[in-house]
Amino acid sequence: MAIFTGAGVAIVTPFKENREVNYEKLGELIDFQINNGTDSIIICGTTGESSTLTHEEHIECIRFAIEYTKKRVPVIAGTGSNCTETAIYLSKEAQVAGADAVLLVTPYYNKATQKGLIEHFTAIAKSIDLPVMLYNVPSRTGCNILPGTAATLVNTVDNIVAMKEASSNIAQVAELAHTCEGKLDIYSGCDDSIVPVMSLGGLGVVSVLSNIAPRQTHDIVAKFLEGDTKGSLDLQLEYLPVINALFSEVNPIPVKKALNLMGFEVGPLRSPLTEMEDAHAKILADEMKKVGLI
């Protein structure tokens, strides 16, 4: 059974002006997502600035999201790390908190070999009794999960069942689907390629766009699954300028700006991330206005 089908939001972590986590605001964001069709909440991922959260904050964000969501949609906890033991610790805490699954990013900076990736993900997955979604984003980690490596993992570790594929390499996604022979659920990790990944058998998207356009992101996937591929593509292309603006600077700088433009008051970023450049922010605002987001 799939962890989820549709559009899952890689939700931001809102901060107060003193940069403490704003849990009240996080609850508002979760309600906004669920009320507008989001199919899953992914907490403490890249978009959630997990790399600048303390372990205590990380675990508390996971606990809060699970308790607040109250099983309305699955909650997937980002628990990956470039330290295997840290990832095991966070994953165990997520299981205790009641997460529906964990999301494990490839180890960053270390640049593990494919053998190292197999050992890393195997150790984490075998430490818990939860479904595991791998997260391949080589542009940020300097490490690429090759299709053969994914096939080895899915064939040897029962609870490794899915991948968020954010390589931006559609040929690699095709090879992944072919090599894993339907045993691995694939989700687009890039908002600009939801439809291409769906056409290769993908089940949906783990989305940044959904933070500001949850209904539309859900509908891109839903239309495709209902057989309305043209409607899905049309909606994907309509929002492409917004998507491009959301990645004109490193994520989550633009999406936090976008949420603040919408009045959500999600607060600042944590250092070393800085506020969006004015020229980029103007383009973002202009594109959001064109589709009625502000």
From Swiss-Prot:
Q: Where in the cell is it found?
A: Cytoplasm
Q: Gene Ontology cellular component?
A: cytosol
Under InterPro entries, the record lists:
Aldolase_TIM, DapA, DapA-like, Schiff_base-form_aldolases_AS, Schiff_base-form_aldolases_CS
Keyword Cytoplasm in record:
yes
Please give the superkingdom of this protein's source: Bacteria
Q: Where is this site: Part of a proton relay during catalysis?
A: 46, 109
| Gene Ontology BP term (one) | lysine biosynthetic process via diaminopimelate
Q: Where along this sequence does the record place binding of pyruvate?
A: 47, 206
**MF terms in GO:** 4-hydroxy-tetrahydrodipicolinate synthase activity
Against SUPFAM superfamilies, the record matches this protein to: Aldolase
Enumerate the Pfam families for this protein: DHDPS (PF00701)
Pathway note: Amino-acid biosynthesis; L-lysine biosynthesis via DAP pathway; (S)-tetrahydrodipicolinate from L-aspartate: step 3/4
- What keyword terms does UniProt attach to this protein? Amino-acid biosynthesis, Cytoplasm, Diaminopimelate biosynthesis, Lyase, Lysine biosynthesis, Schiff base
Q: Which residues form the active site?
A: 135 (proton donor/acceptor), 164 (schiff-base intermediate with substrate)
Which protein family is it in? Answer: Belongs to the DapA family.
Its biological purpose is as follows: Catalyzes the condensation of (S)-aspartate-beta-semialdehyde [(S)-ASA] and pyruvate to 4-hydroxy-tetrahydrodipicolinate (HTPA).
State the PANTHER family in the record: 4-HYDROXY-2-OXOGLUTARATE ALDOLASE, MITOCHONDRIAL, DIHYDRODIPICOLINATE SYNTHASE
Write the protein's name: 4-hydroxy-tetrahydrodipicolinate synthase
Gene field: dapA
